[in-house]
Amino acid sequence: MQGRPNGASGDPNPRNDTSVTIDSDSDNGSRHRIAEVRGSSPSQIVPEKATILNDKVKAGPCLSTEKDLGIRKQLALSHTESIIASNPIAVMPLESPKQRLAMESSTESHRLRRARTRNPWICSGLVLFVTVSALLILSIIVYSYQSLQVDPQGCRTPSMRPTYIKLVGFDSEHTRFASKYGLYLYRERGVDEYSEEDIGIKGVPVLFLPGNAGSYKQGRSLASEASLYFHDVLQYHQERLKTGVRGLDFFMADFNEDMAAFHGQTLLDQAEYVNDALAYILSLYHDPRRPGRDLNLPDPTSVILIGHSMGGIVARTVLTMSNYQTNSVNTIITMSTPHARPPVSFDSDLVHTYKQVNNYWREAYSQKWANNNPLWHVTLISIAGGGGDTIVPSDYTSLSSLVPETHGFTVFTTTIPNVWTGMDHLSIAWCDSFRKVIIRSLFDVIDVRRSSQTKQRADRMSVFKKWYLTGMEVSAERKLPRKEHTTLLTLGDDTKSKSILRQDEKLTLRGFGHRKGPKSHLMPIPPRGGVPEKKLTLLTDQKLNSMETNRKLDVLFCSDFPLRAGQSATLPSLNLDLSGGSASSIRLVCKSAAEDVISLPTSTSSSKFAFDNVPSLSYLQYDLEDLTEYQFVVVIDKAETRYPGWLHAEFSDSSDSVIPTRVGLGRLLSAGLNIRLPAERPMVIDIKVPALHSSLLAYKLHVESKDCDGTELFKPMVRQYISGPYESKFFVNVRDAEINLHGIAPYMPPHIGDNAAATGISFQLWSDASCNGPLQLSLKVDVLGSMGKLAMRYRTVFAAFPLLVVSLVLRQQFKVYNQTGIFISFMQALDLCIRSSIPLLFLGLTFLASSLATSKNTLSKSASPNAGSNSTESVIDFSANDLLLGSQDAFFWFLVPLFGIISIGTCVIVNYVAMILIHALGAIRAILMSRKGYIKHDERGNTSIFWSLSTKNRVINTAVLLLFVATFIPYQFAYVVACVVQLVTCVQASWHARETRSASHSSFYNYVHSIFILMIWILPINVLVLIVWIHDLAVHWLTPFSSNHNVFSILPFMLLVETLTCGTMIPRITTHLRHITYVLFFFLAAYSAIYGVTYAYLLHHITNLVIAWLVGIHFFAGGFSLRNLSRVINDSDGVPNGSPITDGHIKKLP
């Protein structure tokens, strides 16, 4: 039999009655225990007195009959009366005497205690229902994320023959990171000439920066293409060489696969190293002994930076460092780089570094004068892979809150001509079609005749827009108005060599070369000033660009000759006579439209994807105001023999070609959007849907068209696009299309200019109107497909919101414990919270999310007229979307309760996983201990039943660990150690609770188990930094982190864990001080929901504060004294209020 006597708290009006409650376990007759000894006089059972009862009990074997039980009762009563009379010592000074007597002297209290100590595995029906709902929602999200609304990818793997030359001269004399990082030069075998004496530095320097845990070898795809393209093409173009084009020398930074995405100090170290590398690279070109040096060209003063993933952030950080050489960087291209926000917010240094770097760039571009802007000559291009990138949300690649359109932009790979495919996080560094565009754009911006090695900023931006944008954007530049007349066209009066269309007549050509010799088709340009405005659209399957030498078609814009006053009188260099010697002829002076040609994917009956490896279409689009100085659009068929192909051109009214919609999101959800286009319609139609701008929703588009009676020129094609950032997706041969976008996303900072994404999505439709059939479009919200969009946008929420639930559960456990003395299980407390505090808190958070979204919309609308001016940049609150859901749309209020349900289910799953782990380890422990046969529990109640280490050894171990934290190891390592120790404590507590069937041991186990669950949810915040530290050890980098050695960030955790290893239960508090515990846990819960996503690193520190308060309760519940401190350290029984276990019988393990 196990006795559990407990002294009563001091009562100013003592009563002369003593009650004894006997609790027998009917399931196991060998286990009986005295539950309580209650008396009015203050008392405490001392260990020496407790052994008297145990000695009497141990006189024979374990008793199981009623007679034996009666003997035990008599022994207990007589012994208890003697103890009560001789031990007037109060146990809990913070406990209310009246409340204790009221709770402990009633039969109802005993029933409550029995109910409170039920099996921790038991799950109530309500908790089970919520958990099943959470699992169902999570399953839908995962299925949708992996299988629905997934963008197709069409990257082809390139081939290369790499050689990496390590620059050993870049040693510790040049940088303090020489032993940790490295610098390489890429050479293509069989193409680049190099030797040990001459490594072949003759071109423009480019430095590739890998991303998080990335290798410098990821830059080989770009470097190989640069070598091959210059070797095979450019070196034979003398005109290009005269304009300053040279080869590219690709250098690569080796960061030893360091993890800058998890640690801010690592990011700063890499940026410092890159600046040292830039200085060294430029010094190689300044060496007068360098072979092949051209004395007629200036030495380079800048290096082009290309960054992948976090390498792009390193590139931007370079310009903010103290060792940065002014103007050593003026061009930065980044791929899948999270510019707007850090990928995770678990490290304070990383969050602060992001904030400082972004503020620097915003401040620089907010300056009114160029002289005050250190980034005036810098161009920054951010390229995103789209939905296929499952590492970095492509929303984070946006530059809209950092850089004005004059200095940079964000574009998606699905937008880039002749790429037209989404990419994942890794393939964007090697995709064959994409790398070709990158390299060709770099060759177009370099100019070795300038010391900067690049063209002026405006010219660079023009080149990048030409290569990376579709050419149909509002900001797209048209080269035609700025060009000189290049062709003098002479036409005869015969109809065989030319045809002149009527005003507003459409031109359709099916096949070319129907006659010998060229034939011209003249489309009169309508006079300007009409309402509505008109625009020209021309589409053909023939090549029209200037790089095509054997073109079958030419498109010219012509005026009468001689020119009118005010126009250039320079005679054209090309004379094209199609008159056939006719006496009466028409002479026109013309400009070619070849430089304004837009490439579009081919759309035929066999087309599947835009990135199919087939020749593209050529498209021209001009507003009428761009054609005011011309009279004719002339299409010249130059094919000498019959040649298959087609062309369609027309002038259309904007009222017919642009269809605005005013449908709201609510109506779109209920009824969808249906548009019927008539048979007589323009070839190109723009459908604008401003209500669709959120990146959280996905849609389904259905296009239904009538089969063409004759030969169809092309199948319907749809371009889905938004303007901020530049994201376009092409759907060829379209019938059904999955629509998703990267528009307004959660937690994104406001734009520094007009928010183009807020204008919504648009659909540009190309259809063959010659089929004379109507066309039906249907757009509906894809609810199931939209669920998967939550995974990437709110992935940190799934770590922050569960901490809210755990905090409320612990708060409920302490409330019940302070009232009854029983620390209920995690599942019991969760059941109570679901019935009380959790719904109320999530309801309040829902109203808060709606009000925040409404207020943000109001403020953004009121500030929008001045948003673009530099003078108002400082008033923009770039942290406006950091709270809660991070959304400006009140429509998504339902996400708060949705995440609440998921969080509850996640906590239940983690709780059961932890319990399975604890019981599995306990079973292993039992097996190991069973080899020793019988185990004798120490008869002394103040000896630890958990750990065999002495107090002195525990103090020494803790002090040594704290010393290491202060000097060498990060506190995150100590936290992981604390989690392991707490796990072992849970295993010990669980084993003793099962073996003794004691309510006190059950309470202690529930307490340490809940603390362990709390620590588990903080563990991911600390593990990532620990991974960085372990990686540094692996590469023999022993320099300690500067910001992760705060002893006070781990001291409360270590003290609490060490205290719990002694088996000491936290004292009850029934005074007003108990409300501090409740407030602290509620504050942790509220912060987890409101700021947990943006500032997740603070969750550790707030939890640390809560733990410090619990440590204070352990140490100073009876007032500050060395005696209380010694009691906590040496107490070992795990019984509440420091009462010892008096069961000293010998027991054999099962």
Swiss-Prot record:
One of its GO terms (molecular function) is phosphatidylinositol deacylase activity. The chain crosses the membrane at residues 122-142, 790-810, 829-849, 890-910, 960-980, 1010-1030, 1047-1067, 1079-1099, 1102-1122. SUPFAM superfamilies: alpha/beta-Hydrolases (SSF53474). One of its GO terms (cellular component) is endoplasmic reticulum membrane. GO terms for biological process: endoplasmic reticulum to Golgi vesicle-mediated transport; GPI anchor metabolic process; protein transport. Its EC number is 3.1.-.-. It is a multi-pass membrane protein. InterPro entries: AB_hydrolase_fold, PGAP1-ab_dom-like, PGAP1/BST1, PGAP1_TMD. It is found in: Endoplasmic reticulum membrane. Keywords: Endoplasmic reticulum, Glycoprotein, Hydrolase, Membrane, Protein transport, Transmembrane, Transmembrane helix, Transport. It holds the Pfam family PGAP1_TMD. Its main location: endoplasmic reticulum. The active site is at residue 309. PROSITE patterns: LIPASE_SER. Residues 1-43 are annotated as: Disordered. Glycans are attached at residues 16, 28, 818, 870, 942, 1124, 1130. Involved in inositol deacylation of GPI-anchored proteins which plays important roles in the quality control and ER-associated degradation of GPI-anchored proteins. Belongs to the GPI inositol-deacylase family. This is GPI inositol-deacylase. The gene is BST1.
